[in-house]
Structures are given as structure tokens and as C-alpha cells.
């Protein structure tokens, strides 16, 4: 997809500043669904220790070496190390609904806290290529509940209508 002319690489990097405000001092971060790697690189530039995870290297604009791990979220590789924070933007809505709880459980097993940005509307690009790219379109309350199964404190930071910014603190680890 990233090689298709006109395809948007996603909004991940635009959320780095907001997420960094919650993350604070340099720490360990896993960028779940890193896409181009722009957000991961931005966190590295801020001094964070970052691992980038995605189902494909195709969209990467940076060479993360062994800091890139090819993996799906619902079958998260054992090679993904633990980290203090997760960062997951424009990813969860792309999963089939039945994979969402599984992926969240796997993610909560790797990080203590996670910043999410999730779209609550159908994607605009999919119809151009005859595909549905946002497979899980749900209201903010649904996302808060499903994330809340895996994290102790879940907060809706911002609901701009189509996009929900969610902070998840304290992974329960048992899921």
C-alpha cells in the first residue's frame, strides 16, 4: 500500500508530541504497527529506546536494524521485548473485530502503558482500491471497554469525532 501513489502513510507521527507529553522522560517504547517508521524515528530523536513492530517492512523509511520486528499484533512475536510504553496509532481499527481483544492482550503482555489513536469512521482510501481498510469501526465507549480489560486505568484524552486518543495505564498482564 505504501508504494501506491497518493496513499497516506497515516497520522502516527502527528501524535508523537501528544504521546510524549504523557510518556515523559526517555524510556522504552514499542511502536505497534509502525508503518513508515516516522513516529518510531521521532521518538528515537527524543532519546527514547524504541522497537518498531509491523506486519511488513514495505512501508519503512528508516533502517531500524534489529530494532524492527516483523509481526502481527494478534500473534505478537516472542522476539518483541518488554517496554514501559506502547504507541499504537491508526492500527487497531485495521484489525478484524475478533482479533482486537487478542491483540490487546498480547500488547499488554509487552508494555505497562500504551497510547492509542484509533479512528472511529470508515477509511477514505479503501474505496479507491476496492477494499475495506478499517475493519473495526466502533464508538469510543466500546474501545474504552475492550482496552479496559487489559489495562487498569483507561482514559479518553480526546474525542475529535472520528479519532479517539486513549491513554491506557497499568497493564493487567494476565490476559
Predicted segments with their positions:
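Residues at helix C-cap/C′ positions in short coil/turn segments immediately following an alpha-helix
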Residues: 64, 110-111
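Short, glycine/serine-rich, charged loops/turns that create anion-binding
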Residues: 57, 121-123
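Conserved beta-strand signature within the Rossmann-like core of class I S-adenosyl-L-methionine
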Residues: 111-120
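A short His-aromatic
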Residues: 94-95
Amino acid at each position: 500500500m505504501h508504494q501506491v501513489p497518493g496513499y497516506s502513510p497515516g497520522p502516527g507521527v502527528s501524535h508523537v508530541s501528544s504521546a510524549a507529553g504523557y510518556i515523559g522522560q526517555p524510556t522504552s517504547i514499542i511502536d505497534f504497527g509502525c508503518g513508515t517508521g516516522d513516529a518510531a524515528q521521532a521518538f528515537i530523536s527524543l532519546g527514547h529506546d524504541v522497537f518498531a513492530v509491523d506486519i511488513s517492512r514495505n512501508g519503512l523509511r528508516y533502517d531500524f536494524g534489529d530494532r524492527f520486528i516483523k509481526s502481527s499484533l494478534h500473534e505478537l512475536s516472542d522476539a518483541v521485548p518488554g517496554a514501559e510504553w506502547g504507541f499504537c496509532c491508526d492500527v487497531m481499527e485495521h484489525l478484524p473485530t475478533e482479533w482486537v481483544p487478542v491483540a490487546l492482550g498480547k500488547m499488554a503482555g509487552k508494555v505497562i502503558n500504551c497510547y492509542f489513536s484509533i479512528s472511529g469512521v470508515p477509511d477514505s482510501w479503501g474505496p479507491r482500491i476496492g477494499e475495506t481498510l478499517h475493519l473495526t469501526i466502533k464508538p469510543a465507549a466500546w474501545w474504552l471497554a475492550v482496552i479496559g480489560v487489559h489495562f487498569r486505568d483507561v482514559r479518553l484524552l480526546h474525542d475529535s469525532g472520528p479519532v479517539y486518543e486513549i491513554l491506557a495505564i497499568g497493564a493487567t498482564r494476565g490476559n
